[in-house]
Structures are given as structure tokens and as C-alpha cells.
Amino acid sequence: MKTKLKIGDSVKILSGKDKGRIGKIASINRKKNKVIVESCNMVKKVIKARTPQEKGKIIDKEAAIDISNVMIFVKGTSSRLGIRFENNEKIRYLKKNGQRI
């Protein structure tokens, strides 16, 4: 599925345990249709000790969210994204109000 979202875009979570939260996209996996949003969908990950002298750790890490569960968020408005060409330049805009991004 082709997505119009880019790394660094501000998005709103539409479903799941973090529903309603807003964050920036840290990475996009286009093959699996997943995004990682900064400080959202946090999970605990156990890191084993590599040597007997080291201790294991538990860290918080962002887990991936399906692209269909996020929506672009700009200046208090969440909307679908559209693309149009103006003067041979690709412009991304909000479909709800036509605002350019």
C-alpha cells in the first residue's frame, strides 16, 4: 500500500491503547505497512546479559503501529492527505480544508 506519510510528520493515533495521542513518525516500514511513532505504543523489552558479570536489563521501546491506525495532524486538524501538482511541483495538502503541508 502506498502511503503519503513521511518521516517527521506529526500524526494522531486513531486506535489502540494510545488512541488520541499525537507524536512524530520516527520510521516507516513500507513493505509491512507499519510506522514507529516517537513515545507511543511503548513496550518492555528484556535484554539478556552477554557475560556472567553483566546484568540483564528491561528497556522501554516503541513498537510498530499499522499505517491505517494513524492520521496526519497539522495545527489542531487531523485529515487525510492529498497530492496535487502546482507548477510541476508535488504539493501535499489536507483534504479536509485544502491546507498545504
From Swiss-Prot:
Q: Which GO terms describe its biological process?
A: translation
CC terms in the record's Gene Ontology section: ribonucleoprotein complex; ribosome
InterPro entries, A to Z = KOW, Rib_uL2_dom2, Ribosomal_uL24, Ribosomal_uL24_CS, Ribosomal_uL24_KOW, Translation_prot_SH3-like_sf
Pfam families recorded for this chain? KOW (PF00467), ribosomal_L24 (PF17136)
Taxonomically, the superkingdom here is: Bacteria
Supply one GO molecular-function term: rRNA binding
From the record, give the transmembrane residue ranges: none
Q: Indicate the segments annotated as coiled coil, or none if absent.
A: none
What does the UniProt record say this protein does?
One of two assembly initiator proteins, it binds directly to the 5'-end of the 23S rRNA, where it nucleates assembly of the 50S subunit.
Similarity-based family: Belongs to the universal ribosomal protein uL24 family.
The protein's name is Large ribosomal subunit protein uL24
Q: Which gene encodes it?
A: rplX
